Amino acid sequence: MTWGYRLIPEAVKDLKKLDGSQRKQVIKALDKLITNPLPKAEGGYGSPLGSKNGVDLTGFLKIKLRGAGLRIVYKLVRIEGVAYVLIIGARAESEVYEDAMRRIEAFEYWYESLD
């Protein structure tokens, strides 16, 4: 199957805020991700997220860019063959996940339309 990715508008803003080298690393990571965006348990690159400290991201996946100190959180919609990128952010504690949760709540229509 051929996979693609799509950034929600807020994730596009996240990408634009990064410096040039970080932006290149993120784009490279996204290009690698679409070669196999499945969870690691299925041989892919994504690590499943769950519920922790009141933040429920069950059904979402993440990839870490260790060198850049960034995380990318995405929702894989298999039937469409698309990884929807919700947030690109720093790995500071659980901050990126809390921001991701706020984005889900703020864009409930978008989130519901993924399923």
Language model segments and positions:
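A structure-centric signal for secondary-structure junctions around beta-strands
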Residues: 1-2, 57, 80-82
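A short beta-strand-loop micro-motif that forms or neighbors metal/cofactor-
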Residues: 33-35, 80
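Short, conserved clusters of charged catalytic residues that mark active-site
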Residues: 10, 55-58, 69
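Arg/Lys-rich, positively charged N-terminal/basic patches that mediate binding to nucleic acids
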Residues: 1-32, 109-115
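A short, surface-exposed loop/turn module that caps and links secondary-structure elements
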Residues: 35-64
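Enriched for short, Lys/Arg-rich terminal
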Residues: 13, 65-115
